[in-house]
Amino acid sequence: GRPVRIEVEILEKIAPGSGIGSSAASSAAAVYGVNELLGRPFSGKQLVEFAMMGEALLGGTPHADNVGPALLGGVVLVRGYRPFDIVRLPVPDNFFYAVAHPGIVVSTREAREALPKRIPLSDAVAQWGNVGGLVAGFALRDVALIGRSMHDVVAEPYRKGFIPGYDALKEQVLAGGALAMNIAGSGPSVFALASNYEAAVRISGEMKRHFEG
C-alpha cells in the first residue's frame, strides 16, 4: 500500500499525570480510529504495537501496560517485548474496583525517579510470588487470590509518599471490606478492589471523602 497522511483530533477527558493512562487513551484511540477508517486491516495485537509507539513519543519508552487493555479489553499480561507477546486473562464476574484521584499532579518522571535502582533479593522473591498469584487469580477467576496478590513491595513503598494520607486511607478501606488497595500506575490515583458492586460504591465514597478532607 501507499503512505496515507491522517490528522487526528482527540478530545481527552483523562487528566495528564493522573496515573490512569491518559497518554495510552490518546494513543489507543488514534490507532483504533485509523484502523476503522482503513477497513480494519490490522489485528488487535498489531494495534497495540502501533499504540506503543505513541506511548514512546509521549513518555520516552514503548510499553503496552496501558494501551494493551485499552485496545484488547479486560486484563492483559505483557509476557515479553522481544518478541512481543501479550495475553488476555479472564476476569471474575465478581471483580469490582473503585478509583479515586486526590486532585494533585505527580509527573511520571518524578514517580519513576523515586524508585530504587536495586532491590533486595527478598523483595524480588516476594514480588515474583505476588505476580504469579495475580496471574493465577485471574486464570482461576478467584477474586480473593487476586486481592491477596495485590501486595507491591517494589513501587508502592517509594511512591505512596506523593499521595496525601495514603497509609491511613489504605488501612481504612481494607478495614471497610476492600480486598486490596494500591496506586494506579505511577499515581497519584489510587484503586481498591471489591467483590461486589455495593462494596465498591461504599469504598469509592470513603476515598472521595478522604481526599476532599
Specify the residue positions occupied by each region the protein language model found.
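Short beta-strand
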Residues: 180-184
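ATP-dependent small-molecule kinase catalytic core of the GHMP/sugar-kinase superfamily
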Residues: 43-179, 193-212
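Conserved acidic catalytic centers in enzymes
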Residues: 23, 66, 185
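Conserved glycine-rich beta-strand-loop-beta hairpin in the small C-terminal domain of fold type I
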Residues: 188
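Residues at secondary-structure transition points
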Residues: 25-27, 39, 79-80, 191-193
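Anion-binding (especially nucleotide phosphate/pyrophosphate-binding) glycine-rich loop
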Residues: 1-58, 174-175
